[in-house]
Amino acid sequence: AKGRKGSIVAVVKGTRSEDVVAHFRKIPQKLRKQVKEITLDMSGSMKLIARTCFYNAAQTVDRFHVQKLALEALQEIRIKHRWKAIDKENEIIAEAKKKGEKPEFEVFENGDSLKQLLARGRYLLYKSRENWTQSQKERAKILFGKYPDLQKAYQLTDELRKIYNQKIIKSVALLKLAHWFK
């Protein structure tokens, strides 16, 4: 883009703020003051670099990192429930062993045990519901019926994904994000 609007100024290897700042300081301050916006990840070093070198520029967090953070939070909820299910299953096994019986686990209509449901549910949580297979739809119905907090977290993550996937002007996007945040 030869320095025009929307062009990439530099791609710098590494995230050590001292190295990156030294690299950007090679660009004259007059030119760095003209930069209006910087896209960066959520790391503290990137924010420091942006503040130090491009103090007039607005900082925009890369959508990939925002969505990644939301998905990680969603998976954390699933994993928390999975550990509880594993503990419960281990208790059932220990109790059955004491009694000399075969352990009996709850099996859902799709054939999954609770532990399997939470393990296999991992992949559907990464996808938009429009892209689920029939078995993923069935699994989601059971999973969300059993864990309403997981359903709420999935809905929030999916709504965020949809906002980012729309081709809309900035003011509309900000409004949608504000509604999503409530």
Give the ranges of each region predicted by the language model.
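Flexible, active-site-adjacent loop/turn segments at secondary-structure boundaries
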Residues: 10, 62-64
